[in-house]
């Protein structure tokens, strides 16, 4: 038993887990969790609180697993917790791969560099697409390492699982991971001159790459197609999926001017500039013009006005890079380190290996354009790509060709070499920490509408409907938004709804209110509207579509808290 324990403590698995768990604990101890994008908050809200697993961003299987475990882990937001644990597992997998190929000493250095550059963002700023990029990086490296060792045991299957979970969180990054997987194969084949082998020997070299590639593609695409099928299984889920896709497309681009396209917008039911303003703000009304058909029309107009050509993104990437240089953020530091690693790579490797960095850089540039094109946005197009470039470059090091005297010289364990390495790592760590804390945006607690929250909680018999623009600010100061890891209480937002697409239908039914939120606001009892903006446009809309000849619908001020006004809405004769 003692020998087994000692062997376990000396194993590469324990080495990888121990390092990355310690790093995770340190970062969590000195930082605070926050959402990098409000999208992940809404994903966690719908999955963990409302148990609505139909989503165009998150795979249905992952949503179901997360939502089911939420019934057990009540004190945690499982969607966020899983991203933290999966990030730690992915970093550990990358460390394991490095330790297996290069030994623990080099793996330790490589791991510290990767964690210094990327772990702050993964553990403090929650974003599913970044977690997906890390999972896919780790998964494909585990698969490549299994091919190198010709052993398809537990580490290989863990890598496959990481690829699967990466596709669950962001399927668009799946193809980026595949591109780097193929790039490594091509580079390895050329560097080792395998293409000169006779066909039979080349086939035995080529076969495992093809089989692993085909297997991963079939599994990844198959599970994504299953999620797509479930999301489109019936009219209700299909409409939700369609709305989510269109809403993402339109939100990522500037809305067209109503005056320039009023004829097209009139054809889908938006009959005035005021209605269009409500539509842009996020109001949704299936019975009238503020619906999915209008979203589709606006998306078409946006596509015509701003044709999103794949190759046009190249110039935009340079402008993004210039922005990172000016801001001196973590992207710039990561890019500088990548250049340094590539210089070391070219210096250490033979000429036939030295083209690897250029190959990865070219694929990374194309991948950035693809991600920007696929996501219709410039946000986070470089983060996952930089992670993959440096990880695959590190894995591509090959010290086997060095002579014994050269190898001893490179791996010299003298105090001078160790001291220089420590100084470089400390400087890199300090610079990255300063950049991180300099760019962090603290929560403005003085703007938190605490009095409004208290008023809403004190009156559970009332039902409050939020204006969509007001809702964004209202939500952003709730405890669950400020503290992403906290589990949702059973009464979180239980008497709060909105004018957007999704509604608390069960709450409306239980309160004997119409499931049409506009009818519920006008004719329901104890229903109030919370709005920070001017209301006359909303009054005009309600009078036009829900008014009666013998009365007028008006907003009446009831109370005001922290700049938010609570209105009662009713008919006045």
Regions found by a protein language model. Give the residues of each.
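Membrane-interface alpha helices of multi-pass inner-membrane proteins
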Residues: 154-173, 181-182, 212-219
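Short hydrophobic/aromatic helix or loop-helix immediately within or flanking a transmembrane segment
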Residues: 53-77, 81-86
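Signature aromatic-anchored transmembrane alpha helix within multi-pass, membrane-resident enzymes
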Residues: 156, 206-215, 401-434
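Extracytoplasmic loop-helix module adjacent to an early transmembrane segment
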Residues: 16-56, 67
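Membrane-proximal stem/loop segments at transmembrane-domain junctions that anchor or position
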Residues: 231-312, 483-504
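Membrane-interface transmembrane helices that cradle and orient dolichyl/undecaprenyl
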Residues: 139-155
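Transmembrane-helix motifs of polytopic, lipid-linked glycan transferases
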Residues: 85-104, 339-347
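Short periplasmic/luminal acceptor-recognition loop of GT-C membrane glycosyltransferases, typified by
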Residues: 453-537
């Amino acid at each position: 038993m003692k020998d087994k324990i000692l062997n376990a403590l000396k194993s590469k698995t324990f080495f990888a887990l121990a390092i990355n768990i310690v790093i995770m604990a340190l970062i969590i101890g000195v930082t605070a969790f926050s959402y990098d994008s409000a999208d992940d908050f809404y994903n966690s809200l719908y999955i963990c609180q409302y148990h609505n697993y139909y989503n165009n961003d998150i795979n249905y299987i992952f949503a179901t697993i997360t939502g089911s475990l939420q019934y057990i882990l009540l004190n945690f937001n499982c969607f966020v917790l899983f991203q933290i644990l999966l990030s730690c597992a992915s970093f550990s997998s990358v460390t394991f791969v490095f330790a297996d190929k290069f030994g623990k000493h080099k793996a330790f250095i490589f791991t510290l560099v990767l964690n210094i550059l990327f772990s702050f963002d993964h553990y403090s700023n929650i974003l599913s697409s970044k977690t997906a990029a890390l999972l896919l990086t780790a998964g494909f490296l585990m698969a490549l390492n299994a091919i190198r060792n010709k052993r398809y045991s537990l580490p290989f299957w863990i890598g496959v699982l990481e690829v699967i979970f990466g596709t669950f969180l962001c399927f668009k990054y799946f193809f980026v991971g595949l591109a780097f997987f193929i790039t490594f194969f091509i580079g390895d084949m050329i560097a080792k001159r395998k293409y000169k082998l006779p066909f039979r020997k080349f086939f035995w070299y080529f076969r495992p790459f093809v089989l692993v590639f085909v297997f991963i593609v079939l599994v990844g695409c198959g599970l994504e197609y299953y999620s797509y099928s479930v999301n489109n299984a019936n009219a209700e889920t299909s409409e939700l999926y369609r709305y989510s896709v269109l809403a993402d497309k339109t939100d990522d681009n500037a809305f067209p001017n109503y005056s320039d396209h009023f004829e097209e917008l009139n054809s889908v039911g938006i009959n005035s500039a005021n209605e269009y303003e409500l539509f842009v703000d996020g109001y949704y009304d299936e019975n009238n013009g503020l619906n999915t058909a209008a979203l589709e029309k606006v998306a078409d107009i946006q596509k015509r006005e701003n044709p999103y050509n794949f190759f046009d993104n190249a110039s935009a990437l340079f402008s993004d890079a210039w922005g990172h240089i000016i801001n001196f953020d973590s992207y710039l530091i990561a890019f500088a380190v990548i250049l340094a690693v590539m210089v070391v790579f070219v210096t250490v490797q033979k000429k036939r290996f030295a083209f690897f960095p250029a190959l990865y850089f070219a694929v990374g540039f194309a991948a950035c354009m693809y991600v920007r094109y696929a996501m219709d946005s410039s946000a986070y197009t470089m983060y996952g790509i930089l992670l993959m470039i440096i990880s695959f470059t590190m894995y591509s090091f090959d010290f086997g060709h060095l002579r014994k005297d050269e190898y001893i010289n490179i791996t010299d364990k003298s105090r001078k070499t160790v001291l220089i390495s420590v100084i470089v790592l400390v400087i890199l760590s300090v610079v990255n920490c300063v950049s991180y804390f300099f760019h962090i945006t603290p929560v403005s607690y003085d703007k938190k509408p605490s009095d409004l929250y208290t008023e809403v909680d004190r009156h559970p018999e009332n039902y409050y409907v939020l204006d969509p623009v007001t809702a964004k600010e209202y939500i952003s100061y709730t405890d669950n938004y400020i503290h992403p890891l906290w589990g949702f209480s059973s009464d979180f937002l239980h008497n709060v709804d909105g004018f957007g697409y999704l509604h608390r239908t069960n709450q409306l039914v239980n309160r004997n209110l119409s499931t049409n939120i506009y009818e519920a606001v006008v004719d329901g009892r104890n229903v109030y509207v919370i709005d920070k903006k001017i209301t006359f446009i909303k009054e005009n809309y309600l009078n036009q579509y829900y008014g009666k000849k013998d009365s007028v619908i008006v907003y009446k001020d009831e109370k005001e808290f922290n700049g938010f006004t609570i209105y009662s809405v009713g008919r006045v004769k």
